[in-house]
């Protein structure tokens, strides 16, 4: 099928037919299959304009796939304006559902990557974030986004000598599942788990994709990942500062959700917890630190006074979460 036939097929599709096509097709390949010819028709532009003109015909899955198609590869200024139009196609809880759908990708092209990396026009980015903020105003989802470190929090990796390296900590996956389902086991959304790591982002997303693959092998099928940079590996304070910045981005993307942070005592996560309590006290309900360095009782008590709760096991973490009404009794 040549480029003109692709455009004709999509242009003639019924609303339900177009939605079905955009749900099933690899949108990045679709956009790569057409071109703006130097001495011929500008078919890629025509494809983008056609799909943007029919945003009202598309469901959340199709809209998220369209945004991915515009995001993957080179994203020019017209693509970025089209991405902004995708966000404007939804309001209220409909926008929340669309953002969650966008964030379900299993590669580096998630919501944070879309808004804060691929959209590099600050005016367009502010337009997107302004729409998100306006639609979240007064919106009460009543759920939490769980933000978690990885090394020595989910997987024994660096400082902990109690388990073989690579061990998934007992109870951590069950706790993530309970937090995802919430206190009533009837959540508005599932997949509300995001990993905040100091591991650097690279241009091709290879490190992030490797991290996601490792998490899937550990039994975590759906999650998003917020990465750091090489400079942030220099010190624990720089690691912590990057994590707090990533969480600031995340809160800007999901202002209608409350937040919970789970980290460990080995790599600056206590500093992250302090930063969250300082800057996001209005939405952060709990900071839990998994102890891997034998934190003394006096220090634990002092941290608890700051709102940072140190635990030895994920049974202890679950008790803290239940006390705060974050998980059900089941």
Label the model's feature ranges.
Residues 1-148, 327-330:
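Non-catalytic pre-domain segments flanking phosphatase-related domains
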Residues 165-167, 192, 200, 228-232, ...:
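Divalent cation-coordinating acidic motifs and surrounding scaffolds
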């Amino acid at each position: 099928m040549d480029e003109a036939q692709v455009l004709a097929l999509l242009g003639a599709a019924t609303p339900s037919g177009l939605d079905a096509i955009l749900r099933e097709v690899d949108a990045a390949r679709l956009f790569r299959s057409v071109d703006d010819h130097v001495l011929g028709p500008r078919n890629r532009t025509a494809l983008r304009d056609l799909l943007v003109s029919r945003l009202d015909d598309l469901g959340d899955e199709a809209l998220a796939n369209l945004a991915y198609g515009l995001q993957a590869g080179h994203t020019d200024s017209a693509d970025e304006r089209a991405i902004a139009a995708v966000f404007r196609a939804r309001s209220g809880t409909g926008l929340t559902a669309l953002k969650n759908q966008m964030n379900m990708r299993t590669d580096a092209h998630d919501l944070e990557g879309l808004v804060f990396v691929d959209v590099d026009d600050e005016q367009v980015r502010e337009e997107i974030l302004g729409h998100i903020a306006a639609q979240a105003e007064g919106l009460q989802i009543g759920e939490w986004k769980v933000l978690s470190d990885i090394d020595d929090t989910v997987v024994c990796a660096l400082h902990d000598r109690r388990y073989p390296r690579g061990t998934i900590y007992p109870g951590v996956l069950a706790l993530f599942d309970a937090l995802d389902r919430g206190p009533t086991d009837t959540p508005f959304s599932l997949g509300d788990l995001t990993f905040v790591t100091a591991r650097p982002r690279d241009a091709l997303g290879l490190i992030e994709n490797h991290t996601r693959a490792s998490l899937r092998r550990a039994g975590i099928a759906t999650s998003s990942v917020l990465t750091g940079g090489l400079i942030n590996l220099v010190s624990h304070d720089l690691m912590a500062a990057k994590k707090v910045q990533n969480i600031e981005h995340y809160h800007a993307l999901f202002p209608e959700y409350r937040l919970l942070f789970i980290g460990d005592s080995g790599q600056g996560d206590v500093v992250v917890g302090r930063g969250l309590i300082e800057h996001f006290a209005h939405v952060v309900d709990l900071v839990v630190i998994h102890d891997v360095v034998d934190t003394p009782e006096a220090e634990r008590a002092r941290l608890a006074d700051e709102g940072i709760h140190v635990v030895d096991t994920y049974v202890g973490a679950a008790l803290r979460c239940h006390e705060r009404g974050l998980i059900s009794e089941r």
